[in-house]
Amino acid sequence: MNKTYGLLLSLLPLVTAAASAENLPPPVDFNREIRPILSDKCFSCHGPDKKKRKGRLRLDLEKSARDPKKSAIVPGKLEKSELYLRITTDDTDERMPPEESGKSLTAEEIELLSRWITEGARWSEHWAYVPPRKHKLPNVKKTGWPTSWIDRFTLGHIEKSGQEPAPDADPVTLVRRVYFDLTGLPPEPGAVDAFQANPTPKAYEALVDRLLASEHYGERMAAYWLDLVRFADTVGYHGDQDHSISPYRDWVIDSFNADLPFDQFTREQLAGDLLPKATTGQLIATGYNRLLQTSHEGGVQAKEYIAMYAADRVRNVSQVWMGATMGCAQCHAHKYDPYTARDFYAMAAFFADVDDTAHLKNGTNSLPTRREPEISVLNRKQRRQLTVLDKNIANKQALQAKTPAPELTAEIKTLKAERASLQKTARKTMITRATRPRVTRILPRGDWLDDSGPVVEPGIPEFMGTIASGK
């Protein structure tokens, strides 16, 4: 046999295997594809609820699900995995989920579970709890294409899928993209022509810097944040009365434009009133704690609504700052995330010094609603005008002290009247002022009428450890 021919034959299985590997679907993603199935179809009987759990089997915890004594899931061994046998059996008495549950698995779900077990039943933590790690830059063929490290990852995926990078955008497209990305607005007249005349990397960098310095950049970024914190100018219930909170919106815009560090951005919103010598801006930031649906009907049960407001704050803080949904834990331990009812109410205790009792008592159905505590503030333009007026008044008064003159007296009077008129245009905005904290209890199954739950102190979820004292 020809040696070259023999070598080709010997390599054929390797080539075939490589080609087959390329055609295989990607590994099953536990968080995206398996966890939702288990949560929807299995956890009601094999989840965290002790009273409803059957067969002493938990499928919400990896250790229990893969317990060799139970053989519910045997990684890589489909026919020895009780879960697979139960979801594929024709015996209606043995099949899972049971008929009386009103739930059934689709053929696609069964196929996903089967593939997952065959692939080793790999478990994954929720992405929000996985510490970030540095990844090695992928090798790429078009080494001249990437202009930054992130381009290497982009190109790596493109090449892996057998595709080619899109051609570079033309100058007009590039200008339009950067304007919409950074300001949400189309280019102003002349901007496209100017860049077309000089489409160099330095010109592009200068354009980006100019747009980042624009007030519209803060407006663009603030839109995302305001959606997250459920900003609204009305109370949100059936009457949907107006309330005064627009200065908080302006504070968010200003914060993005000023590149306020995120830790400071967070601290001022959650507890700006507790900072030493809190500024007007820091008090405005505490309006975050007042951004929730509120009722001002005469017949509301204060205790019920205080419980609702506390739960709303925990839901929003956990979603916005922790990338998590703690709402389930208001009534019971979360189905698969590591949150308990104690965690939920310990988080609520952080906000027990927000005086919701006073808010309910002082609020009315008038337009706009009266929502103490409030402060009156000027907008950016008005603050600049006030600064100029104060400077002019001080200068005139200094001259008057040296050389008294009737015309100076008249000018000072006019400036002071202008200042007083400007102050009258100030807007009210809701803020937070800490009061004596309410006692916070775990509400069994979220029932605000049930005071039998234990008292909890402010604390972060237990699995996160303890809060540093700062001393």
Could you describe each region identified by the protein language model?
Residues L59, D91-E94, P98-E100, E108-I375, ...:
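Short, structured secondary-structure elements
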Residues G6-A17:
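Bacterial N-terminal signal peptides
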Residues P146, D151, S366-Q423, R427:
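Mature extracytoplasmic enzyme cores
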Residues M1-T4:
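Positively charged n-region of N-terminal signal peptides that target proteins for export
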Residues T409-D451:
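Coiled-coil termination/hinge junctions
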Residues A17-P36, P98-K103, A107, N139-T143, ...:
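Electrostatic cytochrome c docking/interface patches
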Residues P27-S44, K51, L59, V320-T325:
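Local sequence-structure signature of Cys/Sec-based thiol-disulfide redox active-site neighborhoods
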